Amino acid sequence: MNIWLSMLTTTGLGAIIGGFTNHLAIKMLFRPHRPMYIGKFQVPFTPGLIPKRRDELAVQLGKMVVEHLLTPEGIGKKLTNEEFQKGLIHWAQVEVDKVMTNEQSLRHMLEKWDVAHVEKEATEKIEQVIIEKIEAFLEEYYTYTWEQALPHSVHEKIENAIPNVSAFILKRATHFFESEEGKSRLSKMIDDFFASRGALLNLVGMFLGNVSVVDRVQPEVIKFLGQDGTKQLLTDVLQKEWEKLKGRDVKELETFVEKEMIASSILSAVQVEETVGKFLNQSVQQVCEPVRETIIEKVVPGAVTKGLEWGAKNVESILNNLHLAEIVQQEVSTFSTERLEDLVLSITKNELKMITYLGALLGGMIGIVQGLLLLFLK
């Protein structure tokens, strides 16, 4: 009975000592958190291993992440993985579609993004661009003649239109002189003509008798305006003037209208501020609807694919520029010892328990061996 009691005692003590020793060793990895002193002498094994080597641990963790976890090869494979690309494209399409189907106005969206002065800035920028383009256009065309400046099609249209213009002028002139206003104006012109020629008026009056001069002249004027020869004469005159104009410099226009006035007139016609305002008052959905399908189905997949291809080719330089090792090192260095302990224990808690149990098991087995040795020795 005493023999079995001795074996049980040695086994129990061995298990307790083995388990406690391993448990203590595990605790000493983290504790104490700070060095302990007796007088001026530092107590051995203080602080614990991990608090003491925290800076080295941070450096090694950073190296481990870069050299073994987030490697260029691993990230490159992920970026070129077909399933990953499909998932990313689908996600991008959903997110872009959410933005493009937003019913809020562009103005509201920009204000939400703290872009408050976009309307004023856009108006000023567009007006500036228009003015610059107009000035550049005029600067170039002022070196040309009208024949050089106008396209060949315009030349043809003007030359083909000259006979029609002649006919229109003569038609309007005929209608004018047939009217009472035209007759009155013609009468005044005749009176003014003869006013300084009194003797001539008396002579004409002797030939015409009681018929007024204007009654004789008006039909002749109308008859003259209706003749084909008159139309051809006016056409020839207009054609000659057109030929003269073609040889003149465009720059002569500046004597009548300044560049600034031309630019100002065009800006007034375009109404940039009003146009920009109307555009910003539209909803995002209204603006994007014409191109929504193209962007979702073509632009987004193409952009994501190109972006991933570029990322896969340049992943090494991207990682180098990110300095991931330094980021991990800095983050770990900022951890308190308690947080670092909790972090390690949350990962290795079960394994550390098994080590404690293993120590107790080994201690118990050693106790059994000791008990057997004592038994045989007796």
UniProtKB/Swiss-Prot annotation:
Spans traversing the lipid bilayer: 1-21, 357-377
Q: Which GO terms describe its cellular component?
A: plasma membrane
UniProt keyword list: Cell membrane, Membrane, Transmembrane, Transmembrane helix
Q: Which residues form the signal peptide?
A: none
Intracellular or extracellular location(s): Cell membrane
A Pfam family of the record is DUF445
Q: PANTHER family in the record, alphabetically? A: UPF0754 MEMBRANE PROTEIN YHEB
* Family indicated by similarity: Belongs to the UPF0754 family.
Protein name as catalogued: UPF0754 membrane protein BALH_0780
Question: What organism is the protein native to?
Answer: Bacillus thuringiensis (strain Al Hakam)
Q: Supply the source organism's classification.
A: Bacteria, Bacillati, Bacillota, Bacilli, Bacillales
